[in-house]
């Protein structure tokens, strides 16, 4: 997939701040420090489109990115970061729920989990939330380069088991370091935005 345009559009915390456009939207969700920004940067072939940070909880707004005038990526705040106040976490929760359940342009969610570990309770809650609201989901298991090739199947099976993964959903193992899984991720995203057209 050739990326000719990848640009930050705006940040928003409420529907009246969402950008006006006619592109299909794909949200990116995951716990803090799972590698959402690295995923966006790698598949968009940009070094700093989305800001990466060693500090979890950096994304605190809905961040909209126009990709090739074809798709709008929406980076949502990472969940599960303990050092953010309870009030702040609740605020993010309301903002995300409002966006995910009411945005007509939303075609689906890329849910990022760390392939090295079992999904957290928050990961399971998010996956169940998406299934409950019948929001199409792609599970992207990041940090693939951090495990041995011989261990991949075992880790993938563990992630799917913990999530009670629906086989009708798409699963992509991905590495932001090596770009492995990049083409598969794009195929899954394109399938998401073209279904039901």
UniProtKB/Swiss-Prot annotation:
The keyword Manganese does not apply. GTP binds at residues 30-37, 57-61, 75-78, 142-145, 174-176. Its cofactor is Mg(2+). GO terms for cellular component: cytosol. It comes from the Bacteria. Residues 22-195 form the EngB-type G domain. InterPro entries: G_ENGB_dom (IPR030393), GTP-bd (IPR006073), GTP-bd_ribosome_bio_YsxC (IPR019987), P-loop_NTPase (IPR027417), Small_GTP-bd (IPR005225). Mg(2+) binds at residues 37, 59. Pfam families: MMR_HSR1. GO terms for biological process: division septum assembly. GO terms for molecular function: GTP binding; metal ion binding. Keywords: Cell cycle, Cell division, GTP-binding, Magnesium, Metal-binding, Nucleotide-binding, Septation. Belongs to the TRAFAC class TrmE-Era-EngA-EngB-Septin-like GTPase superfamily. EngB GTPase family. Necessary for normal cell division and for the maintenance of normal septation. HAMAP family: GTPase_EngB (MF_00321). This is Probable GTP-binding protein EngB. The lineage of its organism: Bacteria, Bacillati, Bacillota, Bacilli, Bacillales. The gene is engB.
